[in-house]
Amino acid sequence: MDNEQLQKLTEDISLQDFGKPFRHRAFFNDRLKTTGGRYMLSSHNIELNRKYLIEHGRSELVGIIKHELCHYHLHLEGKGYKHRDKDFRDLLQKVGAPRFCTPLQTKKTQKKTYMYRCAACGQQYIKKRAMNPERYACGKCRGKIKRIF
């Protein structure tokens, strides 16, 4: 699905479920990492995360679009458009939009760890940050520290 198809889908959902036209832009923003989508208050555009379409399919994307359209229409009407507002929660329930989207299943990359060992006594040190072993000595025996990996 490209941005033109997404725009058409958003306009169709807006007319069918809300009975109001969507007059702004809806597009994929590949920089979104943890959120399904966002409604931009200043421009009234809707940005959506393409990863949700890939991982969870079209039905999840439709739910996210409905959620963002709730923000959109309520904001333009001057009603409560925030998650905590009663108007927003009522409209979510009316159109069958989810309050939160399903979490993504993509694995987060593990942070690199550095392992050091004392040459004299064999004491191991695991660090999250690299260090210069020339500047440090073993805390147990004062021996030289060598980097393993």
From Swiss-Prot:
<dbReference type="InterPro" id="IPR023524">
    <property type="entry name" value="Uncharacterised_SprT-like"/>
</dbReference>
<feature type="active site">
    <location>
        <position position="68"/>
    </location>
</feature>
<feature type="domain" description="SprT-like">
    <location>
        <begin position="6"/>
        <end position="147"/>
    </location>
</feature>
<dbReference type="GO" id="GO:0008270">
    <property type="term" value="F:zinc ion binding"/>
</dbReference>
<keyword id="KW-0963">Cytoplasm</keyword>
<dbReference type="InterPro" id="IPR035240">
    <property type="entry name" value="SprT_Zn_ribbon"/>
</dbReference>
<feature type="binding site">
    <location>
        <position position="71"/>
    </location>
    <ligand>
        <name>Zn(2+)</name>
    </ligand>
</feature>
<dbReference type="Pfam" id="PF10263">
    <property type="entry name" value="SprT-like"/>
</dbReference>
<keyword id="KW-0862">Zinc</keyword>
<feature type="binding site">
    <location>
        <position position="67"/>
    </location>
    <ligand>
        <name>Zn(2+)</name>
    </ligand>
</feature>
<dbReference type="Pfam" id="PF17283">
    <property type="entry name" value="Zn_ribbon_SprT"/>
</dbReference>
<dbReference type="GO" id="GO:0006950">
    <property type="term" value="P:response to stress"/>
</dbReference>
<dbReference type="InterPro" id="IPR006640">
    <property type="entry name" value="SprT-like_domain"/>
</dbReference>
<protein>
    <recommendedName>
        <fullName>Protein SprT-like</fullName>
    </recommendedName>
</protein>
<dbReference type="GO" id="GO:0005737">
    <property type="term" value="C:cytoplasm"/>
</dbReference>
<comment type="similarity">
    <text>Belongs to the SprT family.</text>
</comment>
<keyword id="KW-0479">Metal-binding</keyword>
